[in-house]
């Protein structure tokens, strides 16, 4: 029987830097870390990643240095085997800290897997009327997300398919456009400034 967790030493897992969509059949990386509520040194903690079938797809040990700007998030960059099928996936992350003060911890991670990219899409966003490039526009090309740079452009690599292209930025009307991607291409989007709400007139 495992030792009960000391309530003063509650451990938790954080997972970040997993690209989504993940390309099927390719190895990818993510970062995972373990922290104790009492700030314990968790260097050497085992962190393992399992897919929906319970198959281990990656793992490693937390390093000696906490993640920058944290006092006790001990982390590792892990290589993992990507799924072989497209769509949504839910994996589990399991961590075991050294010693008996901390119970084993489990968390989940959800992501999308996609076919390998085939074509490069350049997206140009300008403002209606002025023609000025619009920076920092959040773009979604199907499951792929990107944002425009200061020149109002962004690039994304996608497999050939029909995609809904959505653009959003505060102060502009949301824009949706359908595009059939069968080769390298450029998509130009024209965004309209959102009208300011009418102010009520008070006597």
Language-model features, listed with the residues they occupy:
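Beta-strand-rich domain onsets/edges
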Residues: 2-27, 107-120, 185-202
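A short, amphipathic beta-strand motif
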Residues: 32, 119-127
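A short, solvent-exposed loop/turn motif at the edges and junctions
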Residues: 98-101, 166-180, 192-196
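Short Pro-Gly-centered beta-turn/loop motif in secreted/extracellular proteins
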Residues: 155-164, 169-170
